[in-house]
Amino acid sequence: MSENIETPRNLSKRGWATVEGIMPKIKDVVAERSKKMNTNIDLSTAENWLLRPELVALCKDAIMDDLLPKHFSYPKGFSGDPELLDAYCQFFNEYFQPNVIVEPSHLATAPGAMACVDTLLYNICDPGEGVLCPGPYWNGFDFGFRVRSSVTPVLVSLPSLEDNFSDKVISALEEEYKIASMPIKALIITNPHNPLAVCYPKRLLKAFLKFCEKHDLHFISDEIYALSVFQNPEVKDNHNFVSALSIDLKSIGVSPSRVHVVWSMSKDFGQSGFRMGVTVTQANPGMAVGLALAANTQTSSLSAICAIKLLASPQLPSLLAKNAERLSNAYKTLTEFFKKYGIAYFPANAGLYVFARLTHAETWDEEAEAINKLKSAGVLVSGGKAYHGPESEKGWARVLFAVEPEVLKEAIRRMETVYSVL
């Protein structure tokens, strides 16, 4: 991809505004991923490699056993393949403990979780309107909100990382809503949190929902890491994942029409390349139609075959148990390295990565320098500045651990060449 973006080259005003705003932020990542030969170990991209041997075998069997001539046609169904929707319903009703049973009419499929969020924003917001995002938040929202829907993520700053899980976040939301320079239409959270990799407590989820009801906002809960929870005695609170689907909305005076949950196969099952996302909206038929219109033919029948096989598989409970065990072991391996070199980190138990505070990085420039030193050693990590954390919290990085054990060990060996001489 050319780095010369000085001239619009006949783009629409809308298209050029998006390119001009985003390319300077992502050109280095684009260049890195475009290399034909790349010996760097990527601990910056949140992908789960830990179940892939089992999943490869399961997906091969699915294609071998279940691929039929009909799968070469456009997918049937308005909001997704009917068999896939049934499998999703079975999955949500088993693992998300919904207060209201999930039915096929509540679902709309899309090619990935970000596509689900995009279709929600397209139907919730007009161009130029905003969505509240408590920081730190996943930096993919920065361009994912803007590319098609032209929606602005509105940072809600907090004094410390821990404040994300206290009542202080509600006060911060109220203040940001009051001073926002644009109309605010929704609040979005990732639960489990990205990049902090812990779960929100149920009482705080209820507070978020009441805040949205008070201000007539939509509530979007991105629950893409819902089943990537593992045991960690370092995490004293918020051990268990609680889905927004599980909350009795009527009992707290919240209209279910404003609540939307997003999930995909990407993280819990390590299938980010399959592009299989789904939105659950249980009491808003108009929204469900809008979501289906936006993405009803964009999911692959081949991916659907594999998803149906996996979600309905009798092996699913054991696969989830293996995933949790392997995540726990990988987390211990990485954090033992952190402890050895005095690297502080945010204790995690729900996700694929650790948010770690790099040593000798007290400014944004020093953070960038520390990231570049690791890159020079052959390890890519994701700099904390991109996640919009507190101004007082400089020098952080999100570091993936959900890779094959031998790859993680090699990454640690490379990182030791940096930290052993500091």
Language model feature labels by segment:
Residues 214-215, 341, 377, 422:
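Helix C-cap/helix->beta junction micro-motif
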Residues 69-214, 220, 226-253:
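Conserved core of the PLP fold type I
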Residues 4-112, 163, 168, 311-312, ...:
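N-terminal small-domain helix-loop-helix segment of the aminotransferase-like
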Residues 324-335, 339, 344-358:
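Conserved glycine-rich beta-strand-loop-beta hairpin in the small C-terminal domain of fold type I
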Residues 91, 246-325, 332-338, 413, ...:
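Conserved core segment of the aminotransferase class I/II
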Residues 90, 98-101, 254-255, 281, ...:
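PLP-dependent enzyme catalytic core of the Aspartate aminotransferase-like
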Residues 40-42, 262, 344-349:
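Short beta-strand
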